[in-house]
C-alpha cells in the first residue's frame, strides 16, 4: 500500500474510546475486509460466554469455580449479596488499615512509622503488584515497596541488604491464595529469620493476604499478625491485581486505588459492548486469532514506549501464557494452545532485538503501546524545536513503519497519559481480551494444570534429596558416585536428578556434602564430611 492508502486504512480501522482515554489501531494488521464478518458468530458466542461468566456461571469447569475478577471493580454485578458485601467490606478494610499505617495509629514496635514494605509472593501474587508499583510509583511514595518473588536465597539477601537497618520500619505482606505455596512460604521464613536476627518480632510487623482458613491464614491468626485480608476461590492469581493482592500494596505505597478501580470499571463497561467493532477487547482477541491462526503460530511482542511500562510485558506474559497455554480444549481434545509473549520497552529495543524483528524470521506480531503525555511540565529542547519526548514518539513511529515495510504486522494502543486510571484500563482490557480469545479457541483460561505438574515434580526431587542425604549421613566418610547412590537408595532411574542434587549440595555448606574429583565429572564421589 502507498501512504495515502495506509492513511485511508488507518481511518477505517482506528477505534477511538474517549470514555477510557484510549485508541486502538488495527490498520497495520493485514486481515481481509471480510474477516470480522467471518468471525462474527464465534465472537458473539464469546461475548455471551463472558456475560454468563459475569453472571456467576461456572467458567472454570475443570475446578468447578466461578470467575469473578470483574466484580471487584463493580461489586453490584456479583451474583450474590454475600459476595458483593465481602468485596465492599474488604475495600473499606484496606483503606482503613492504610490510613492507620500512614497516620501512625498502627506503627512499628520502635514507635516510628512504617517507611518500607516487603511483599512476599510469586506469580500473580507478585507480578501484578510489581507492575503497578513500578508504573505509578514516585520519589514521594509514602511507603517504598520491596519484593521477594522467588525462592532464591541470594536474591532475598540482596533485598534485605537494600532494606538494611530500615527493617525495623518495614511492614511485610505475605500473599498466597492457598497458603501453601512453597516459594512464598520460604520467603516468609527467610524474612522471619531476618526480623528475629535484629531482635524484632515478625508477627508484630506482618500482614497476610490469603484464602480463608488456609495454612497461612491459620498461622497469621495463631501468631497475632497485624491484619488478614481475603483471597476468594473465584479469583485467580493472574487476575488478582484489583483484589487485596494488588490494592493493599498500592494503597500503602500511596497510590490512587480508586482511580485504578475506576479505570478498570470503565474499561469493563466499554468491553461489554456487543457490537464487535466498538469493543476494543473483542478486537484485540480477534487480531490475536488472525495473527496466530488461532493456534499460536506467531509470538506476541509487547513494545511500550514508556519506561514506566517496562514490567507490563512480564505481567502480560503470565496473564496470557498461563491462561492460553493449554494442552486440552474444553471438550478434552488435545489442542496444545498458546501464544508466546515477550517484550521490553522502546526505544531501548531498537538497539536490541528489533533488528531481528525487521530482518529475521517473521514469526511474530507487535503490539506498540504509545503514551501521548511525556511528563508533568515542559521539556527542554534537545535539538531546535525538538524534545526528548518528540524523539521517543519519532522512534515509535519509525519502528512501526520500518517493520511494516518488511511485512511485519502490528497493533498500536494509544493512551492519553499514564495514571492510575489508565493502568486500570490496560489491566482490564487485557483480562477481557484473554477471556474472549480463550472462548474463540475453546479452552479454559482460568486454571493452570501445568504449573501444578511442575510443583509435583519438584516435590519428587526433594523427596529423593532427603533419601540421598540420609544415606550419605549414615555412611559418613564414604564416597559415592551418583549412580552408586541411585542404586543404594533403590532409585536407579533417577541418577541424573541425584547427580544434580549432589552438585548443588556440595556447592553449599548446608548439608555438609563434599565432592572429590574423579577421572570424569561423572566419576566424582560425594560424601558427608560432617
UniProtKB/Swiss-Prot annotation:
Protein location: Cytoplasm
Family, per entry: Belongs to the GPI family.
Record function comment: Catalyzes the reversible isomerization of glucose-6-phosphate to fructose-6-phosphate.
Pathway: Carbohydrate biosynthesis; gluconeogenesis; Carbohydrate degradation; glycolysis; D-glyceraldehyde 3-phosphate and glycerone phosphate from D-glucose: step 2/4
Entry's EC annotation: 5.3.1.9
Molecular function in Gene Ontology: carbohydrate derivative binding; glucose-6-phosphate isomerase activity; monosaccharide binding
Taxonomy, superkingdom: Bacteria
Organism of provenance: Geotalea daltonii (strain DSM 22248 / JCM 15807 / FRC-32)
Annotated CDD domains: SIS_PGI_1, SIS_PGI_2
Entry-linked InterPro entries: G6P_Isomerase, Phosphoglucose_isomerase_CS, SIS_dom_sf, SIS_PGI_1, SIS_PGI_2
Keywords: Cytoplasm, Gluconeogenesis, Glycolysis, Isomerase
Gene name, Swiss-Prot/TrEMBL: pgi
Protein name: Glucose-6-phosphate isomerase
GO cellular component, as recorded: cytosol
